[in-house]
């Protein structure tokens, strides 16, 4: 019988995110669990089918292979030498399944039945979580303490994370005999995979806890205080150990990773620890020179001296007025870039004065003189 589409099995679309795939699997696992469908002879097969689908779609590499090739990506017999006896190829009867299982997982997919080896019946660590946090440049400069709300799974207090109703205990998984692993022979290799029935836990729950539906964990938003040090930039990662998802069956929690994004600022641009600020100045100020006042990222004011005859794009430096270094050391600098502004909406008198000034400044614009001299030479050469 043809295998069903894995996305269809989990009730999600092909464009579903990893979170949507996880939610779809949890929903199907609760709905199809054999212990909750004892009168349905198809429940166990459908439950295994959902586990098989999730094993592929939760893994980015396997998902990519499935999206491209479908079920054919995980069929056996994909090339290699021929004729070897089962378990042979390396001599001495060694079991290389653990060494090669990660490599061949991507080739051969899920296997049910077969032998098993140790590894089940143990607690498992919870997943790591990612939280994207946007802050402004001022906060990145000074650092701050911020409270965030993180949706995550925590250990169920009703069953203390066991997943079993009070007075009952999980029982050994019949598929893997409590080992959490199943093996299958593929030509030369013995390939080991996580048991699809118990998801590697080695146990199944006949009387699931009503609070967590047998998951051993419940969804809850948590308020966490995060210390953001001065000098962070976009891409900085902050690790909060043990603040990820709760582990299964009393296992340790995963970690929470805070990824910082520093928002763009209306006045300052950042390059490492240096800051850049573009400051407009009048033609008169640029020509005559003088002192101007500029803002600094700490909310203060700085003064820079503009040399006479300054052009647009000229930069001046305020040392130590940039961003602090994240891991210590001296702060960066702040660079002031001049933007000489041409006046608009001139009065008649202003136009007269500018026209008079232009007549008197024939020898005061060396760049213009050089440019038009080059233009004249170019035209003369074209005539020849």
Swiss-Prot record:
Basic and acidic residues: compositionally biased ranges: 31-47
The entry's keywords: Chaperone, Cytoplasm, DNA replication, Metal-binding, Repeat, Stress response, Zinc, Zinc-finger
Source domain of life: Bacteria
GO BP, sorted A to Z: chaperone cofactor-dependent protein refolding; DNA replication; protein refolding; response to heat
Chain ranges of zinc fingers (CR-type): 143-221
Localization per Swiss-Prot or TrEMBL: Cytoplasm
Stretches assigned to the J domain: 5-70
Per-repeat ranges for CXXCXGXG motif: 156-163, 173-180, 195-202, 209-216
Residues involved in Zn(2+) 2 binding: 173, 176, 195, 198
Binding residue positions for Zn(2+) 1: 156, 159, 209, 212
Hydrolase in keyword set: no
Chief location: cytoplasm
Gene3D superfamilies: DnaJ domain (1.10.287.110), Heat shock protein DnaJ, cysteine-rich domain (2.10.230.10), Urease metallochaperone UreE, N-terminal domain (2.60.260.20)
SMART domains the record matches: DnaJ
PROSITE patterns from the UniProt entry: DNAJ_1, DNAJ_2, ZF_CR
Subunit structure: Homodimer.
HAMAP family in the record: DnaJ
Domain text: The J domain is necessary and sufficient to stimulate DnaK ATPase activity. Zinc center 1 plays an important role in the autonomous, DnaK-independent chaperone activity of DnaJ. Zinc center 2 is essential for interaction with DnaK and for DnaJ activity.
Family: Belongs to the DnaJ family.
UniProt name for this protein: Chaperone protein DnaJ
Organism: Roseobacter denitrificans (strain ATCC 33942 / OCh 114) (Erythrobacter sp. (strain OCh 114))
Gene from which this protein is expressed: dnaJ
């Amino acid at each position: 019988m043809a295998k069903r589409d894995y996305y269809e099995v989990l009730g999600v679309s092909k464009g579903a995110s990893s979170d949507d795939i996880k939610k779809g699997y949890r929903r199907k696992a609760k709905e199809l669990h054999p212990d909750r469908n004892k009168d349905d002879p198809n429940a166990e097969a459908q439950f295994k089918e959902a586990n098989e689908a999730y094993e592929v779609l939760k893994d980015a590499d396997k998902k990519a292979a499935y999206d491209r090739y479908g079920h054919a990506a995980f069929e056996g017999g994909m090339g290699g030498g021929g004729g070897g006896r089962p378990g042979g190829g390396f001599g001495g009867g060694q079991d290389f399944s653990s060494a090669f299982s990660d490599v061949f997982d991507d080739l051969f997919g899920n296997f049910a039945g077969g032998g098993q080896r140790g590894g089940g019946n143990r607690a498992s660590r919870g997943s790591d979580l990612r939280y994207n946090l946007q802050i402004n440049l001022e906060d990145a400069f000074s650092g701050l303490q911020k409270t965030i709300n993180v949706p995550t799974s925590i250990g169920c207090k009703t069953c203390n994370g066991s997943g079993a109703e009070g007075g009952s205990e999980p029982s050994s998984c019949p598929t893997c005999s409590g080992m959490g692993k199943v093996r299958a022979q593929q030509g030369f290799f013995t390939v080991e995979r996580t048991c699809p029935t118990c998801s590697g836990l080695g146990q199944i729950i006949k009387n699931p806890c009503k609070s967590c539906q047998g998951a051993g964990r419940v969804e809850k938003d948590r308020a966490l205080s995060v210390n953001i040090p001065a000098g962070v930039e976009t891409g900085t990662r902050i690790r909060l150990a043990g603040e990820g998802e709760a582990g299964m069956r009393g296992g340790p929690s995963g970690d929470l990773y805070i990824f910082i994004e520093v928002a763009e600022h209306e006045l300052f641009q950042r390059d490492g620890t240096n800051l850049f600020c573009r400051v407009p100045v009048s033609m008169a100020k640029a020509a005559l020179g003088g002192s101007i006042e500029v803002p600094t990222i700490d909310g203060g004011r700085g003064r820079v001296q503009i040399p006479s005859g300054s052009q647009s794009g000229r930069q001046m430096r305020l040392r130590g007025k940039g961003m602090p270094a994240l891991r210590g050391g001296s702060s960066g600098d702040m660079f002031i870039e001049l933007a000489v502004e041409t006046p608009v909406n001139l009065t008649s008198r202003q136009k007269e004065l500018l026209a008079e000034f232009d007549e008197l400044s024939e020898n005061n614009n060396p760049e213009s003189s050089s440019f038009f001299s080059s233009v004249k030479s170019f035209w003369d050469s074209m005539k020849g």
